UniProtKB/Swiss-Prot annotation:
The keyword DNA-binding does not apply. The keyword Lyase applies. GO terms for biological process: 'de novo' pyrimidine nucleobase biosynthetic process; 'de novo' UMP biosynthetic process. Catalyzes the decarboxylation of orotidine 5'-monophosphate (OMP) to uridine 5'-monophosphate (UMP). Pathway: Pyrimidine metabolism; UMP biosynthesis via de novo pathway; UMP from orotate: step 2/2. The active site is at K63. This is Orotidine 5'-phosphate decarboxylase. InterPro entries: Aldolase_TIM, OMPdecase, OMPdecase_AS, OMPdecase_bac, OMPdeCOase_dom, RibuloseP-bd_barrel. Belongs to the OMP decarboxylase family. Type 1 subfamily. GO terms for cellular component: cytosol. One of its GO terms (molecular function) is orotidine-5'-phosphate decarboxylase activity. It comes from Streptococcus uberis (strain ATCC BAA-854 / 0140J).
Length: 230
């Protein structure tokens, strides 16, 4: 059973901002953090090594989407960093997903992005020319991801039950778009609270601004963690 902790999205522009944020947490507070494209491209692999040296788990969210051989080679590089989780785009197809799994190895969690939580059904149809419902598109990508033997998908909490019904109960569902009650939903169109997401079957949740922009990030994190574990 993989440990399930709320993942903090460290969507910062530079190394110093990240250090200042993490310094607000006790040294023995083991976190699970997400490092996205902005921070990784600004700092490079050093950012992963630094966060791992503090004893934290790292979800490196790069959403790789390229030809299978390139993705496989890139995953081999990421595996050497000691990351705990990373992402690819499900739209890359089964061959690319299988190549990603082979390159990364079996230990780190490998999940695929289905449809971004900022995507509406109208946007999907107009911009991606996918003429199904949003849920049908997500379920299609989830089934293809399971076929490629990845660990799970990134999805809205609203889609978790349906995804597990067409894959398996052990197929991981990581859900962004999580907001504590009474907070601004920002640019996320499909959101839930931590407790609601846990109740519906989410295995991991990702929370950013409600923690990183809180007056007291440590207190905000503990409140969200308590809600998740309630």
């Amino acid at each position: 059973m993989r440990e399930q902790r709320p993942i903090i999205a460290l969507d910062f522009p530079d190394f110093d901002t990240l250090k200042d944020f993490l310094n607000q947490f006790p040294k023995d507070e083991a976190l699970y953090v997400k490092i996205g494209m902005e921070l990784y491209y600004a700092v490079g692999p050093e950012i992963v090594r630094y966060v791992k040296s503090l004893g934290h788990s790292v979800f490196l969210d790069l959403k790789l989407h390229d030809i299978p051989n390139t993705v496989k080679s890139t995953m081999k590089v990421l595996a050497k960093m000691g990351i705990d989780m990373t992402t690819v785009q499900a739209a890359g197809g089964v061959e690319m997903l299988e190549a990603a799994r082979e390159g990364l190895g079996d230990d780190p969690i490998l999940i695929a992005v289905t449809q971004l939580t900022s995507t509406s059904e109208e946007q999907m149809r107009e911009d991606q020319n996918i003429q199904t419902t949003l849920t049908e598109s997500v379920l299609h990508y989830a089934k293809r991801t399971a076929l490629a033997k990845l660990d799970g998908v990134v999805c809205s909490a609203h889609e978790v039950e349906a995804i597990k019904s067409v894959t398996s109960k052990d197929f991981l569902c990581l859900t962004p778009g999580i907001r504590p009650k009474g907070t601004d939903i920002g640019d996320q169109k499909r959101v839930m609270t931590p407790q609601e997401a846990k109740a519906i079957g989410s295995d991991f949740i990702v929370v950013g601004r409600p923690i990183t922009q809180a007056p007291d990030p440590l207190a905000a994190y503990h409140a969200i963690k308590a809600d998740w574990n309630a």
